[in-house]
């Protein structure tokens, strides 16, 4: 990748790097764009780019994957499991890689007109993916490792706010959201 916004080589823990390296390798082989979102993106940006220690650390990695439909998502899931390093969990979006939990969240053409996804086969679990496309479009590329090279996209702090997580950002910065009407 070109246009590295930050070089964070040597700043992430090896299990996280191993997980992201394999995830990205599999996604790239299937031409599936991905980016780190949620608290994991927040923590990487605040801690390693700006030197701000998060008040609460996240216990998982959240990834957005741009897929055309459920067949492409299933292909990604099966390919991850086929590596022998990823294991499914009872939650449809969640996988385990060693001790690390990964939530893989599909967005893009897979969503309906309201930007929602409905998880098969029952389609009873519904998630809003509002803001994911915009967050991906304005994501930054960071180098997490130089050897082997691991360049990955991260949602920016404004992207996290677009995604509806301003409270997460305020808490991370040690601030409190304003009270309604105040």
How should each PLM-predicted stretch be described?
Residues 1-182:
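Compositionally biased terminal segments of proteins
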């Amino acid at each position: 990748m070109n246009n590295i916004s930050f070089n964070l080589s040597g700043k992430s823990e090896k299990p996280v790097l191993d997980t992201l390296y394999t995830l990205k390798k599999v996604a790239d082989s299937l031409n599936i764009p991905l980016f780190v979102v949620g608290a994991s993106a927040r923590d990487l940006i605040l801690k390693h780019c700006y030197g701000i220690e998060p008040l609460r650390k996240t216990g998982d990695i959240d990834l957005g994957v741009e897929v055309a439909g459920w067949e492409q998502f299933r292909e990604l899931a099966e390919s991850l499991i086929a590596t022998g390093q990823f294991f499914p969990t009872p939650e449809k979006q969640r996988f385990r890689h060693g001790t690390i939990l990964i939530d893989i969240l599909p967005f893009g053409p897979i969503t309906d007109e309201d930007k929602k996804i409905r998880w098969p086969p029952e389609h009873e679990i519904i998630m809003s993916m509002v803001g994911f496309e915009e967050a991906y479009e304005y994501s930054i590329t960071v180098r997490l490792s130089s050897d082997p090279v691991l360049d990955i996209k991260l949602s920016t702090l404004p992207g996290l706010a677009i995604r509806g997580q301003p409270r997460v950002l305020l808490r991370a910065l040690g601030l409190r959201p304003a009270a309604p009407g105040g």
